[in-house]
């Protein structure tokens, strides 16, 4: 950690604040779990855990999407607030999970390739791993500018026994998970 002193002139007085900033001395491996999380469920949390453990990730960021392009109607601000709070409550007991609101704007569409490009610009020394479920994987070619996503991160795709991803091997890393309680 690095401590930096900040001197501020406020009115006639001068205040000194100490700001603690985390200085990254090494590359971090960050997993990205995007989605509507409507609602977030145990499958999302288990997928985050599997990715964290199996690929030696440092953190998993959950990004609730406020206005996904594949949805017909826009969320209200109130509905988005509820989804954010559900995610916050679901991940709060796991110190490796954090909430990121980069895609939470309900007034415009957010696209994964733009979000990942943005993260790479802000954190150029970090490695990003975009985590997908099997259903999203098989619709991946329908995503806007999906090929650009491959240049910004490694794709971790969760597979179920009944799915075949052989056509996409070489572009993605498969994340084999145990059956979730939802699959039973």
Model-derived segments and spans:
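Positively charged, low-complexity intrinsically disordered leader regions
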Residues: 5-23
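Short, solvent-exposed loop/turn segments at secondary-structure junctions
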Residues: 37-38, 67-69, 135-137, 161-163
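N-terminal catalytic cores of NTP/NDP-binding nucleotidyl/phosphoryl-transfer enzymes
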Residues: 28-56, 61-66
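Conserved small/polar residues in nucleotide/adenosyl-binding loops
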Residues: 176-183
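Short, aromatic/basic amphipathic alpha-helical patches
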Residues: 166-175
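Short, flexible loop segments at boundaries between secondary-structure elements
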Residues: 153-167
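N-terminal Rossmann-like or analogous alpha/beta NTP/dinucleotide-binding catalytic cores
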Residues: 69-154
């Amino acid at each position: 950690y690095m401590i930096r002193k900040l001197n501020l002139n406020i009115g006639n007085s001068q205040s000194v604040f100490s700001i603690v900033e985390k200085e990254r001395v090494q590359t971090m491996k960050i997993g990205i779990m995007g989605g509507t999380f409507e609602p977030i469920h145990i499958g999302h949390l288990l997928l985050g855990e599997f990715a964290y453990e199996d690929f030696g990730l440092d953190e998993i960021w959950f990004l609730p999407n406020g206005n996904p392009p594949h949805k017909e109607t826009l969320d209200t601000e109130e509905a988005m607030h509820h989804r954010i709070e559900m995610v916050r409550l679901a991940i709060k007991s796991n110190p490796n999970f954090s909430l990121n609101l980069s895609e939470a704007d309900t007034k415009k569409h957010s696209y994964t390739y733009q979000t990942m490009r943005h993260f790479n610009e802000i954190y150029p020394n970090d490695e990003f791993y975009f985590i997908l479920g099997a259903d999203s994987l098989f619709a991946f070619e329908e995503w806007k500018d999906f090929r650009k996503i491959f240049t910004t991160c490694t794709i971790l795709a969760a597979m179920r026994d009944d799915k075949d991803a052989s056509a996409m091997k070489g572009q993605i890393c498969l994340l084999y998970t145990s059956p979730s309680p939802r699959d039973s």
